[in-house]
C-alpha cells in the first residue's frame, strides 16, 4: 500500500516511527531507576545548608491557596539521604519539608510542583536565619494533559476495550504515558489517504517492539537466543490490542480538556515520600523496608542482585543471591523476625531467604517430587503482611507458571503443588497470582488474574473448595490482602474495582468502583490503623 505524498510502504512507515522513538522509552517503561518508599522519619542532614528548614506556600495567580499540591525537591549533588523528597500542601496551601532536606541553593531549579490543571510559573525565596521560605506560584491551564494521570485518556473507552488494553499493556507501563503520547503524535503526523491503516501499522510496530524489549530487559543476563518479538511475554494478541489502540487513539493525544480524580488524594500535610535512585542498568520493580536501622531492600529482576539502601544516609550495597543460575528476585515478603523471603522470576526456580542480619542466605530449589518446576509469585501471609505458615510449618505459594498452589517445607525441602481446577468458558492462561492465608492457618485464598477467578484451598485436606467466577474474564483479580477478621479484599486490576469478601462466611460483602475505573489497582494492603 502506498501513501499519498509519501511514496513509502507500510513497512517503511513502521521503521521510521520506531527510528524516531526516543530511546528514553526503554528507561521509563522497563527500568525503574527509583526505588521509593513512604516514610515519616527525618534522617540527619549534612552540608553547609544542613541546618536550614524549608517551608512555604503554593498559590495561584489570584493569590488563592492550592490544597493537596504535590511539592517535590531534588537536593544538591553532595547531599546524603533521599534523592527526591515530596510533601503535600494543607488547605491553606502550606507545605513543610523534613529537616533532612536542608537548604536549597537554587529553588527555582530544584522545586517541582504538581497540581491537576495547573503549571508552575515561579518560585521565590525568602531566607530568615535558619529558615528558608518558598512561595510557589501556579498558573491555571485549560490543557490538563501534562498533569492528569494516564488513565484520564481511557475515560471514553468501552469497558471491554479498557480491560483488554489494561490487561495486556499496563503491567509494564502506563498507557498512554508521555512517551506513548509522543508516539501517537508521530503517527498522527503521517499524511495518508488511509489514516486508519497508518494507525494500525504504527501501533503494531510499537506493540512488537514493547514485547521484544520487555523480554530483553526482564530476561536473565546472558540468556540466548534473543527473544522473539512475536511470541515474547506481554501482549498475547497483537491484533486485538493494536485494533483497540488504532480505534481509540485517533489523534496526537497532546490536548486533554478535563479530568477529575473523583476523590481527594490519599495524602495529608504530614505525608512524606522519599525516593532513592539506584544506578542503571537495573530493572527494579519491588522493595521492602526492614531492619534496625531501617533499610530499603530492592530487587533487581534482571539479575541476581538485591540493593540495600540506608534510608538515613542513602548509602547502597549490592547483595548477590547465591544461586547457580539466573534467578531474577521478584516478589519480596517480610518475615516476623525482620528477615526477607524472595521469590524468583526465572525458571531456575529457587526460593531465597535473607536472615535479619542482612548477611546470611538460605536457598531452596523448587522442584516437585515428580521433578516439575514451579514458578512462585506470592508467598502466604496474613493480616500483618508477613510470612505465615500452616500449622506444619509449610510455606504456601501461588505457582503462576502452572496455575497452581503449592507448598515448600523449609525443613525438608519437599515441594508439592496442586493445579487449580479449570472452569468452563474460562480457557487461556489463568496465571494464578495473589495469595493470602486465613487466621486459622487452614485455608489459603488465591486469585487468577488471567481469567477473572478467585478461590480457596484447604491446606489440611489438600482440596480446592471455593471458586468465585467474576462476570468478566478480563476483570483481573490480582494481589490480595486480608484483615484480622478474615475479610479479604480483591483488587480488580482490569475493571478498576475492589471486592470485599468474608472468607469465614464464604460471602461477598460488596464490590466498589474506584473513583477512576482506569486507575489499575495492582495490589491492596490491610491497614488496621485507618
Please identify what each model-predicted range represents.
Residues 53-67:
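Structural motif
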Residues 77-98:
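Short, acidic Ser/Thr/Gly-rich low-complexity loop/linker segments typical of extracellular
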Residues 78-80, 103-125:
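A short, solvent-exposed loop/turn motif at the edges and junctions
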Residues 126-149:
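Extracellular beta-sheet/turn segments enriched in Thr/Pro/Gly and aliphatic residues
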Residues 166-177:
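The canonical Cys-X-X-Cys-His
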Residues 280-293, 324-337, 370-392, 423-441, ...:
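Beta-rich, blade/repeat-based domains predominating
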Residues 297-302, 342-347, 390, 395-401, ...:
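Conserved beta-strand positions in repeat-built beta-propeller and related beta-rich domains
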Residues 310-314, 355-359, 409-413, 458-462, ...:
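Short loop/turn segments that connect beta-strands within beta-propeller blades
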Amino acid at each position: 500500500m502506498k501513501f499519498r505524498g509519501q511514496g513509502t510502504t507500510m513497512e517503511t512507515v513502521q521503521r521510521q516511527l520506531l527510528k524516531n522513538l526516543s530511546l528514553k522509552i526503554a528507561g521509563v517503561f522497563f527500568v525503574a531507576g527509583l526505588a521509593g518508599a513512604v516514610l515519616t522519619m527525618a534522617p540527619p542532614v549534612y552540608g553547609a545548608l544542613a541546618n536550614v528548614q524549608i517551608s512555604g506556600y503554593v498559590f495561584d495567580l489570584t493569590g488563592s491557596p492550592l490544597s493537596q499540591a504535590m511539592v517535590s525537591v531534588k537536593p544538591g549533588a553532595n547531599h546524603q539521604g533521599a534523592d527526591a523528597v515530596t510533601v503535600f500542601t494543607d488547605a491553606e496551601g502550606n507545605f513543610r519539608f523534613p529537616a533532612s532536606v536542608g537548604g536549597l541553593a537554587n529553588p527555582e531549579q530544584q522545586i517541582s510542583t504538581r497540581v491537576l490543571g495547573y503549571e508552575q510559573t515561579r518560585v521565590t525565596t525568602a531566607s530568615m536565619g535558619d529558615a528558608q521560605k518558598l512561595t510557589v506560584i501556579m498558573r491555571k491551564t485549560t490543557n490538563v494533559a501534562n498533569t492528569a494521570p494516564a488513565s484520564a485518556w481511557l475515560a471514553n473507552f468501552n469497558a471491554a476495550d479498557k480491560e483488554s488494553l489494561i490487561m495486556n499493556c499496563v503491567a509494564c507501563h502506563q498507557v498512554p504515558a508521555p512517551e506513548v503520547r509522543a508516539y501517537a503524535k508521530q503517527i498522527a503526523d503521517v499524511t495518508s489517504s488511509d489514516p486508519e491503516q497508518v494507525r494500525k501499522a504504527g501501533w503494531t510496530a510499537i506493540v512488537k517492539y514493547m514485547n521484544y524489549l520487555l523480554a530483553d530487559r526482564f530476561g536473565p543476563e546472558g540468556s540466548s537466543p534473543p527473544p522473539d518479538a512475536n511470541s515474547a511475554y506481554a501482549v498475547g494478541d497483537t491484533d486485538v490490542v493494536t485494533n483497540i489502540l488504532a480505534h481509540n487513539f485517533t489523534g496526537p493525544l497532546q490536548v486533554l480538556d478535563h479530568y477529575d480524580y473523583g476523590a481527594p488524594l490519599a495524602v495529608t500535610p504530614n505525608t512524606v515520600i522519599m525516593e532513592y535512585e539506584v544506578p542503571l542498568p537495573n530493572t527494579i520493580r519491588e522493595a521492602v523496608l526492614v531492619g534496625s536501622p531501617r533499610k530499603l531492600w530492592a530487587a533487581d529482576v534482571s539479575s541476581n542482585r538485591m540493593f540495600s539502601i540506608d534510608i538515613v544516609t542513602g548509602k547502597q550495597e549490592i547483595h548477590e543471591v547465591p544461586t547457580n543460575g539466573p534467578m531474577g528476585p521478584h516478589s519480596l515478603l517480610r518475615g516476623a523476625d525482620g528477615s526477607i523471603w524472595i521469590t524468583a522470576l526465572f525458571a531456575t526456580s529457587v526460593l531465597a531467604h535473607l536472615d535479619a542480619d542482612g548477611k546470611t542466605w538460605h536457598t531452596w530449589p523448587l522442584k516437585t517430587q515428580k521433578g516439575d518446576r514451579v514458578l512462585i509469585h506470592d508467598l502466604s501471609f496474613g493480616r500483618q503482611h508477613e510470612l505465615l505458615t500452616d500449622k506444619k510449618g509449610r510455606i504456601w505459594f501461588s505457582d503462576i507458571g502452572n496455575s497452581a498452589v503449592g507448598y515448600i517445607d523449609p525443613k525438608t525441602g519437599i515441594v508439592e503443588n496442586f493445579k487449580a481446577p479449570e472452569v468452563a468458558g474460562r480457557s487461556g492462561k489463568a496465571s494464578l497470582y495473589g495469595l493470602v492465608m486465613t487466621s486459622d492457618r487452614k485455608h489459603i485464598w488465591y486469585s487468577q488474574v488471567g481469567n477473572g477467578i478467585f478461590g480457596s484451598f484447604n491446606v489440611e485436606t489438600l482440596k480446592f473448595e471455593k471458586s468465585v467466577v467474576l462476570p468478566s474474564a478480563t476483570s483481573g483479580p490480582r494481589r490480595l490482602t486480608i484483615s484480622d477478621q478474615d475479610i479479604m479484599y480483591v483488587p480488580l486490576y482490569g475493571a478498576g474495582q475492589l471486592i470485599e469478601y468474608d472468607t469465614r462466611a464464604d460471602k461477598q460483602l460488596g464490590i466498589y468502583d474506584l473513583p477512576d475505573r482506569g486507575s489499575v489497582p495492582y495490589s491492596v494492603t490491610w491497614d488496621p490503623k485507618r
